[in-house]
Structures are given as C-alpha cells and as structure tokens.
Amino acid sequence: MNPNFLDFEQPIADLQAKIEELRLVGNDNSLNIGDEIARLQDKSESLTEGIFGNLTSWQIARLARHPQRPYTLDYINHLFTEFEELHGDRHFSDDAAIVGGTARLDGQPVMVIGHQKGREVREKVRRNFGMPRPEGYRKACRLMEMAERFKMPILTFIDTPGAYPGIDAEERNQSEAIAWNLRVMARLKTPIIATVIGEGGSGGALAIGVCDQLNMLQYSTYAVISPEGCASILWRTAEKAPEAAEAMGVTAERLKDLGIVDKVIPEPLGGAHRNPAVMAAAMREQLNSQLHMLKSLDTDALLARRYERLMSYGIA
C-alpha cells in the first residue's frame, strides 16, 4: 500500500494508482485520455470527502500521527521569517525534541516554541521521537521568560506522544520541569497562543500548552493518555484503542464542545500533509487575528482572562 495512505484511505489510494497508470499510458502513446483522468479525479475527490466526513475518533488519532504530517519546523518555514533557533537550558544540555527561537510573523517579533519528532530514523532518534526530557522543558521555560522580558508574544506548537518516561529523565526531575512550566506560563506577562498540530499527549503537551488561546488543527488530538494506553489499563489490551479513543473524547471538535479548545482550524481535504502550504495559510490568518485581539488587552486584563480560563477547566 502507498505509504502516503492509511488503511481506511485504501479506496482513495486505489483510485490514485489508476490515475497514475493512465497518465503513464497517455505519456507513452500520446493518447488523449484527459477526460477519463478528470472523471477519476472527480471521483477521488468525492470519495475523499465521503471518507473524511465520517472519520471515527480512532481514525483521527491515527491521522494526527501520520508520518508525513507537517511538524513544527515545517510550519516555522511556512509561517515565519528571520527564525533564529536558540539552544540549551543553561542547566544540563540541549534537547532536540523541543525547538524554539525568535522569529517574525508578518513582521511582528515573536518567540516560537514547539515539539519536533523527526522524519528519518537518525533524526527521530536524535529528537527522541518528539518526547522531551526535562532539559527540553527547561529550555522552553528559558525562552518564554526571555520573551516576557522583551515583550514578545509566545507561539507554541504541540505535537508529542508525551514527556519521555525514561530513568534518566526521572533522575533529572521530569515532573518538576513540567510543573514549573505550568506555574511560569500561568504568570507570564505576555500573550501566549498554543496550537495542537498533531498529538497532544498528556503533561508533555501541557508543559507548553498553558495559554490565552488554544487552537487545534481539525485532525489533531489532545488527551491525558494515548488511546492504546487507556485501552491497556481499562480493557487489558491495546486492541480496544478504537473504543478508548471514542470514550476519551480526544478530537478537536469534542474538546471544542467542552470549552477546552477555543478554535478548531480546518485542514485541507485529506489532512494537513496533503497541502502544508494551505494549512499554514489558514494558521497564519488565525494567529494574526488572535494576536491582534490579545495585544489589545492590558497586562492585568490578560492575566485575569488567562486565570479565569484555567479555572474554568472541569466546570460543566
């Protein structure tokens, strides 16, 4: 099966394969088969709309992990200019699972911070598959405090299975690093906008997710545990992950209904990985609009709004 497609997209993959075959035949024999190709393309688009209009929570969770889905550095390249990556937590080391630095969004200085999973095997290992260690969160905290000092808005991009649970991370106090970030972000005197672009896994996501405005891409997820992890606890088997995903309410629309998410940003047909440029354009529009709104608030109003937002979690 084409690696671009997940199993529930197989009918789309089959149609795309037929279209490619016809294009090759046309190129080889100079045949005019444009009408047939156009018909199949229309059929493929209609089929895609049908499949993506009825996705289950588990299918959305799998889309959120798609290996070709744009990562933080992809969006940085599309959205920002003058990005200058900053490294290190000034305590232990640099963690490549968190990237961050100064940049400009349509000319406006901002601090950008996000998880980075990696594409190829070596990069995935170097970035620990997007699972930060304490030094990653401490680096993020250092950059956020720098942003406050220079009166720069903070934009975070969330995409992680969770914080790294290894022994070395626990030895360096993983839970303290996450908790400290929550404390600091709740008090920062600068606007914070967080966007879930893929997986939002537990405290590893929340550690850069305390904000004034929370966005989720249409096919992203946000939860305290993975569907497989939940299923393994409740049903003693990861095979119940589809049921767990539905029960947990991990999708953007469900979380919007609960009042946790402020804005669901629609994705291109087939997901963000089908057209990253279009996805980035939609994100740019939202980020600019939200920054304009938040910058109109004075510091006291900004912090009061953030506090009220945090305290409203869990209230029906």
Curated annotation (Swiss-Prot):
Residues 39-293 form the CoA carboxyltransferase C-terminal domain. Keywords: ATP-binding, Cytoplasm, Fatty acid biosynthesis, Fatty acid metabolism, Lipid biosynthesis, Lipid metabolism, Nucleotide-binding, Transferase. InterPro entries: Acetyl_CoA_COase_a_su (IPR001095), ClpP/crotonase-like_dom_sf (IPR029045), COA_CT_C (IPR011763). It catalyses: N(6)-carboxybiotinyl-L-lysyl-[protein] + acetyl-CoA = N(6)-biotinyl-L-lysyl-[protein] + malonyl-CoA. Acetyl-CoA carboxylase is a heterohexamer composed of biotin carboxyl carrier protein (AccB), biotin carboxylase (AccC) and two subunits each of ACCase subunit alpha (AccA) and ACCase subunit beta (AccD). NCBIfam families: accA, AccA_sub, PRK05724.1. This is Acetyl-coenzyme A carboxylase carboxyl transferase subunit alpha.
